[in-house]
Every structure is written in C-alpha cells, then in structure tokens.
UniProtKB/Swiss-Prot annotation:
This is Bifunctional protein FolD. The keyword NADP applies. It holds the Pfam family THF_DHG_CYH. Its EC number is 1.5.1.5, 3.5.4.9. It comes from Rickettsia africae (strain ESF-5). It catalyses: (6R)-5,10-methylene-5,6,7,8-tetrahydrofolate + NADP(+) = (6R)-5,10-methenyltetrahydrofolate + NADPH; (6R)-5,10-methenyltetrahydrofolate + H2O = (6R)-10-formyltetrahydrofolate + H(+).
C-alpha cells in the first residue's frame, strides 16, 4: 500500500534546491552561509542529531562550526559564548541543541540568540511574529516540515479539521498557528485531554507529538485520515519508533509518515532552509 509520506525524499528535493541556490549566491557574493551549532554536554541522542545536521549542511555547501561545551557550564558563560556568535558576521545562523542540562536556564539561553540568527525560531520575538500573523523572522523547523509534508498530499487545507496532540513550543503551538493561517479548524490536545480517541477519529489530519511510543493505535483514526507522526522515541541505542503504531495503522488510513524517515529529515531540511534565509537577510543588511 503506497500511502507512506516519504519525508526523506521530500527533504532531498528541498536540499537539492538549496544546493543550487547556495551555489548561485556564492558565485555572486564570494561568500557562503555558515551555521554555528552549540552542543552542551554529551547527550547521545543530541550528538546523533547534530551529526545529521552537519552532514546535510556540508552536502549542500553550508559551512558549520561545532562548539562543544561542558555540561557544567553556567548560564551566564553560555550566554557570553552566544553573544560572541551573535557578533560574528561570518555566522549566518545559530542553533543551541536541546535539551540543555537542567542547571541551565533554557529560556534565557534561547532569548540570548539574536533573532536574526535564530534559525530554530525559538526567540520570543520570532514566536511573537508567528502568532501575530506577521510574515517576518523564523518559524520552528519541525512545524514547517509537518506543514510541507501535509501540503504535498493535501494542497488545499481550507476547512480541514486538524487535531494536534502536543502543545510544545517546538511543534504543537507553532504548527497550530501555521494551520490557522491555512484556514484549518485546529484542535490542540495533550496528556490531560479527555476522550482523545473520539476527537482524533473525526479529524481529517492528526499530528502526533506527545513522546509516547506507539500510543496511537488504529482506533484513533478514520480511513481518510492523514497521519503525521512527530514522535521520536528511542527504545535502544540504534532503534527509534514514533507515537503511532505504524505497522497496524498504515493500512487503515489515507496517508502516514514513518519513523524514522518521516518528519525528521524534513526538520533538518527546513533548518538549513532557514540558514540560507538568514544568510540572504544578512547580505541585504550589509548592502543597506
């Protein structure tokens, strides 16, 4: 049954376009985008994610600077390091890899990144732009990846009923803003929602982002459902699964993303797309 939304293939299309765009920009300006990645501590999952980001960046011509810092670093010292990157004109975008150690004030760190280099879209100013409907700044990459995957198979979203399970600042909240802009009717559910199954089973599109392995079984969906699984649940050193019971759900819905190979590659593709946007914005700033 060919109803799998191949996030890897979609991401590769985006990356191919970005590679050509970077080549053209480099030939015109004799400069290239550069991405700074701040990694605090030695969380094994974070190390893997960073490795994927660097690998894909290099493939398309984005230079990277990886800054490894001790998990014992103080919040103020980390802010000082971020400020150095903010002031470095060669750096187009900055990522602070999450999660951070519990001793660090995450909100202070995310607010320290310059909004013009905040390619994750987590700075309060960029969050405000998104939820105010202002077409400026950066939007969180996983939300962008989800929307692109949905629109590939359902280009006209006007009037669609969408249920998002998860209310995080990374996925649930930004995606709800994007879908409202597409004229969807959006319901956000979470761990305290009652009768979740009765809500999701009536939806045209269900986005699962709760971090609960295989939580959503076939009964949560209908035959016309488009299912976007954002869950990344590591069950061993080399195996991850989603929030949706993919094996039993796939044949009972219209379209579904796998884990891995679904939204993960799309997230990286849009992260790099945001990096190129930041690079182009910086060129414009230097010209004015």
């Amino acid at each position: 049954m060919n109803n799998i939304i191949d996030g890897k293939a979609l991401a590769n299309e985006i990356l191919a376009d970005l590679k050509l765009e970077i080549q053209e920009l480099t030939s015109q300006t004799n400069a290239s985008p550069k991405l700074a990645i701040v990694l605090v501590g030695d969380n094994p999952a974070s190390i893997i994610y960073v490795r994927h980001k660097i690998k894909n960046a290099h493939k398309i011509g984005i230079y990277t600077l990886l800054i490894n810092l001790s998990a014992t670093i103080h919040t103020n010292d980390l802010i000082s390091k971020i400020n150095e990157l903010n002031l470095d004109n060669e750096i187009s975008g900055i990522i602070v890899q999450l999660p951070l150690p519990s001793s660090i004030d995450k909100n202070k760190i995310l607010s320290a990144v310059s909004p013009s280099k905040d390619i994750d879209g987590f700075h309060p100013l960029n969050v405000g732009y998104l939820h105010s409907g202002i077409s400026q700044g950066f939007i969180p990459c996983t939300a962008l990846g989800c929307l692109a995957a949905i629109k590939k198979y359902e280009p006209n979203l006007t009037g669609k009923n969408v249920v998002i399970i998860g209310r995080s600042n990374i996925v649930g909240k930004p995606l709800s803003a994007l879908l409202l802009k597409e004229n969807c009717s959006v319901t956000i559910c979470h761990s305290k929602t009652h009768n979740l199954r009765s809500i999701t089973s009536k939806a045209d599109i269900v986005v699962a982002a709760i971090g609960s392995p295989l939580k959503l079984t076939a009964e949560y969906f209908n035959p016309k459902s488009i299912v976007i699984d954002v869950g990344i649940n590591r069950i061993s050193s080399n195996k991850i699964i989603g929030d949706v019971d993919f094996e039993n759900v796939q044949s009972k819905v219209q379209y579904i993303t796998p884990v891995p190979g679904g939204i993960g590659p799309m997230t990286i593709a849009f992260l790099l797309k945001n990096t190129v946007k930041a690079f182009k914005d910086s060129l414009y700033t230097l010209d004015t």
